[in-house]
């Protein structure tokens, strides 16, 4: 039972007994460093509620100090864990007895799943969508942030006690795919990933670029012949051929379908390698080629319910002006679906495929904010009860400092290249620091990748998802400050202590706590609440910054007290136990961020 769970009913009882008042919510916060106390109750919200003859002789409202003192005295007299209190400007700072922290620590010190909640069979599952790439080019820096956010949010929600499914929708059809296919036919000379030595997604991306170059040449030639740029873009032979290929695909022409399947498989194989290196995975896959017709049958249901309306030209719309939005088309006049229709149908299909799904999280950039507001509102108006449990995990752009890691085309940073660069940067810094003499070459390679990818993931995930960010590769691999390697180094330092502790650390110890020990236990105690808060807010940044605070507290503890050199055996054992729990917490929290920790550095 957490400290808040102990204090909450006691304070409610105190208020009921003192003022004959029943309240629903008590507001707590951490006690500020400059004040004496372990947890603080905010008094202000109660002041306007309490006005009774028992409060003051004339029945006037209490001032903050009077109210705080009355509640504080009640807690000292009636709650064993409360040792003392003080009131500062409307805040009741509560001092908790040493025994509470000792007992709490002894209860959780060997709990490998501390902070994690097992899912209930009765709770609905959450489906988290992320990645969702096009199959005409490799994954890039934007996909990296998307994948890291989606994967981490899924893991955090799972740790909070929900069953989770990870999914993506792959945009495997359309004119952009046909551009790569046509360019390969024209310029590829039957090149394959095997003959070229390129990953499949990079090979297909190469021909997407080749198409664009050829297209620009044809546009320029037509403009020299007197065409306007707009006319040239429409009349260039290569774009007309690509459009015909799309029509052939839609008609199911065997040769086009065979090439489409072959080149898409090259891309999927390439993506699989990138996902494996990035450390993300999926439980299910949806393909636009299978889903683009979904939702059309829902349009008729919407018309029958009066949710949708048909225009004279036969197109179908929904009028959301009363909801502060616009009219939105859901079916074109020629009967073809739009993206919104497809997304409606895909959401419904997912609930059919996974009957226990009761909510979904869509990890998509903030340029799609309006799209998801409309999508969720349409699904609600169609009467789906799970529509109220849909969430758009909107995130900002991620950029690199100018001149850093530009791709050959000078526009997009390739995800594979970024991971390789991070590993190389980690290698250079590690070699400069030394201490690698005892490592085999294989161990070094694993260490460099662990540090490099840990730096990349932590630097991205520590930022509030809603904010745009600048990713600085060199800064992210720094071994000091709010970085992944700094936290990994602290974990490795603790593992070194544990290897040197050649004595039994499983015994139960009761000792007077040093202030630094108490602060560490208080920080550890916050972990379950942080997980719940991060899940509710879909924010890995809350986990990342919690771990940074824990590591800062541990390093202060490490600098202040003696651990293995402590002469008092009980204190020595307790400090090693405490160190181990900090390491365990770092490790489990980093799993929520998809980050590995090295046993030594």
UniProtKB/Swiss-Prot annotation:
Leading EC class: ligase
Reaction catalysed by this enzyme: tRNA(Arg) + L-arginine + ATP = L-arginyl-tRNA(Arg) + AMP + diphosphate
GO BP annotations, alphabetical order: arginyl-tRNA aminoacylation
Motif ('HIGH' region): 133-143
Gene3D superfamilies, alphabetized: Arginyl tRNA synthetase N-terminal domain, HUPs, Isoleucyl-tRNA Synthetase, Domain 1
Gene Ontology molecular functions: arginine-tRNA ligase activity; ATP binding
Keywords, ordered alphabetically: Aminoacyl-tRNA synthetase, ATP-binding, Cytoplasm, Ligase, Nucleotide-binding, Protein biosynthesis
InterPro entries with a match to the protein in the record: aa-tRNA-synth_I_CS, Arg-tRNA-ligase, Arg-tRNA-synth_N, Arg-tRNA-synth_N_sf, ArgRS_core, DALR_anticod-bd, Rossmann-like_a/b/a_fold, tRNAsynth_Ia_anticodon-bd
Pfam families recorded: DALR_1 (PF05746), tRNA-synt_1d (PF00750)
Predominant subcellular localization, coarse grouping: cytoplasm
Localization terms from the record: Cytoplasm
GO cellular component, one term: cytoplasm
Enzyme Commission no: 6.1.1.19
PROSITE patterns: AA_TRNA_LIGASE_I
Quaternary state and interactors: Monomer.
Family per record: Belongs to the class-I aminoacyl-tRNA synthetase family.
HAMAP family for this protein: Arg_tRNA_synth
Protein name (Swiss-Prot/TrEMBL): Arginine--tRNA ligase
Organism of derivation: Flavobacterium psychrophilum (strain ATCC 49511 / DSM 21280 / CIP 103535 / JIP02/86)
Lineage: Bacteria, Pseudomonadati, Bacteroidota, Flavobacteriia, Flavobacteriales
């Amino acid at each position: 039972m957490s400290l808040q769970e102990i204090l909450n009913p006691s304070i409610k009882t105190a208020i009921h007994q003192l003022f004959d008042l029943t309240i629903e919510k008590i507001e707590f916060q951490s006690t500020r460093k400059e004040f004496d106390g372990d947890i603080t109750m905010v008094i202000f919200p109660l002041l306007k509620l309490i006005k009774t003859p028992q409060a003051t002789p004339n029945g006037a409202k209490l001032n903050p100090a009077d109210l705080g003192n009355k509640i504080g005295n009640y807690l000292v007299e009636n709650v064993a864990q409360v040792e003392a209190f003080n009131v500062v400007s409307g805040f009741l700072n509560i001092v908790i007895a040493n025994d509470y922290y000792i007992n709490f620590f002894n209860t959780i010190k060997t709990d490998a799943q501390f902070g994690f909640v097992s899912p209930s069979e009765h709770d609905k599952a959450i489906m988290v969508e992320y990645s969702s790439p096009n199959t005409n080019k490799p994954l890039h820096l934007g996909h990296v942030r998307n994948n890291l956010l989606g994967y981490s949010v899924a893991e955090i929600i799972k740790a909070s006690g929900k069953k989770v499914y990870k999914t993506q929708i792959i945009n495997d059809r359309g004119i952009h795919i046909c551009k790569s296919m046509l360019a390969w036919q024209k310029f590829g000379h039957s090149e394959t990933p095997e003959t070229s030595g390129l990953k499949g997604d990079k090979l297909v991306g190469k021909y997407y670029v080749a198409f664009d170059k050829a297209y620009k040449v044809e546009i320029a030639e037509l403009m020299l012949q007197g065409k306007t740029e707009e006319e040239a873009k429409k009349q260039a032979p290569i774009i007309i051929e690509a459009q015909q290929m799309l029509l052939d695909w839609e008609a199911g022409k065997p040769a086009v379908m065979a090439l489409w399947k072959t080149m898409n498989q090259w891309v999927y194989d390439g993506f699989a390698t990138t996902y494996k290196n990035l450390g993300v995975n999926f439980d299910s896959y949806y393909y636009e080629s299978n889903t683009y017709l979904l939702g059309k049958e829902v349009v008729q249901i919407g018309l029958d319910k009066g949710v949708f309306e048909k225009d004279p030209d036969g197109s179908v719309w929904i009028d959301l002006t009363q909801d502060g939005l616009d009219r939105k088309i859901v079916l074109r006049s020629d009967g073809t679906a739009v993206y919104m229709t497809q997304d409606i149908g895909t959401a419904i299909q997912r609930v059919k495929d996974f009957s226990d799904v009761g909510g979904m999280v869509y990890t998509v950039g903030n340029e799609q904010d309006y799209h998801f507001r409309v999508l969720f509102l349409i699904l609600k108006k169609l009467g789906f009860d799970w529509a109220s449990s849909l969430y758009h995990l909107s995130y900002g752009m991620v950029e690199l400092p100018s001149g850093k890691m530009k791709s050959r085309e000078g526009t997009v940073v390739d995800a594979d290249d970024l991971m390789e660069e991070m590993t190389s940067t980690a290698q250079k810094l590690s070699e400069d620091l030394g201490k690698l003499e005892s490592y085999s070459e294989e161990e070094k390679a694993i260490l460099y990748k662990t540090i490099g990818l840990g730096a990349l993931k932590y630097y991205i995930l520590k930022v509030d998802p809603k904010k745009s960010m600048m990713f600085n590769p060199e800064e992210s691999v720094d071994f000091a400050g709010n970085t992944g390697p700094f936290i990994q180094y602290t974990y490795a330092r603790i593992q070194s202590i544990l290897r040197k502790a050649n004595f039994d650390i499983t015994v139960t110890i009761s000792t007077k706590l040093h202030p630094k020990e108490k602060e560490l236990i208080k920080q550890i105690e916050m972990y379950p609440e942080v997980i719940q808060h991060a899940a509710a807010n879909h924010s890995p940044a809350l986990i990342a910054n919690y771990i940074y605070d824990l590591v800062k507290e541990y390093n202060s503890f490490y600098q202040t007290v003696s651990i293995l050199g402590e002469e008092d055996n009980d204190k020595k054992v307790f400090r090693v136990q405490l160190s181990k729990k900090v390491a365990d917490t770092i490790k489990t929290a980093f799993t929520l961020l998809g980050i590995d920790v090295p046993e030594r550095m």
